[in-house]
Amino acid sequence: MEKVDRIIQMEIGRINSHLPKARKSLCELLKEDSPSIELRDGSLHYFRRSELEFLKTLAGEEACLVKLPIILELSTLDRGYFVVRGRGEVRVIKKLLELSEDIYLEENTVRLPRYYLPTIRRKLPTTTVYAFITEW
């Protein structure tokens, strides 16, 4: 069973190669001429400036707390939901989806139904990314 687990972990690592090596704050990216980050596979991912400006309006005073890209975690255990982590990121997603602050009380993590994913990705295509998480 050990070998199978190792193979699964390698495959998950490979399908997550599009994730960033390190994330940058929204404020940092807005200062760059060509806002981008380096991915785990060594390539660069570029952000649309218009999208960054839109996020800034959603984040308000907390713009520097928002780390990009916002990671949408998809788990093998919790198939009907996804998770967003980080205070700034959670606030932005709640505002984007027009969710009441008191519906999802946790401040640093939010677990939402997957049917919100198309809306998020349509409005934030360059500033959000999927992460595939295996749990068993």
UniProtKB/Swiss-Prot annotation:
Record-stated family: Belongs to the UPF0216 family.
NCBIfam families: PRK04115.1
Species classification: Archaea, Methanobacteriati, Methanobacteriota, Thermococci, Thermococcales
This protein's name: UPF0216 protein PF0452
InterPro entries referenced in this protein's UniProt entry, alphabetically: UPF0216 (IPR002746)
